[in-house]
């Protein structure tokens, strides 16, 4: 059974997918992480909801710069108490 999305989750994921389809191909691959920041944002919103997922995505995007080594950075699980 598919999980239903709230209207805010739908809006946020649609905006991110729009970025993936229309803007990202023009800019080319720039993300230092696996999964990419946009995929991370969609997964974080699905797992944690809109507010907390967007917060995780913002923190991740702020780490995505040339001085950070990047690498693997999965979305923390929902029941993880360290992600407050």
From Swiss-Prot:
Locations listed in the record: Cell inner membrane
InterPro entries hit by this protein: Membr_insert_effic_factor_YidD (IPR002696)
SMART domains the record matches: Haemolytic
GO cellular component: plasma membrane
Pfam family for this entry, one: YidD
Major subcellular site: membrane
Keywords: Cell inner membrane, Cell membrane, Membrane
Membrane-topology descriptor: Peripheral membrane protein
The protein's role, per its UniProt record: Could be involved in insertion of integral membrane proteins into the membrane.
HAMAP family (UniProt xref): UPF0161_YidD
Family, per entry: Belongs to the UPF0161 family.
Protein's name according to its UniProt entry: Putative membrane protein insertion efficiency factor
């Amino acid at each position: 059974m598919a999980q239903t999305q709230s209207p805010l989750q739908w809006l946020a994921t649609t905006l991110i997918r729009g970025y993936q389809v229309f803007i990202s191909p023009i800019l080319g691959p720039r993300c230092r992480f696996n999964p990419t920041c946009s995929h991370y944002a969609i997964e974080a919103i699905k797992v944690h909801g809109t507010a907390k997922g967007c917060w995780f995505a913002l923190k991740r995007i702020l780490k995505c710069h040339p001085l950070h080594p990047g690498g693997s950075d999965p979305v923390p699980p929902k029941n993880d108490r360290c992600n407050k």
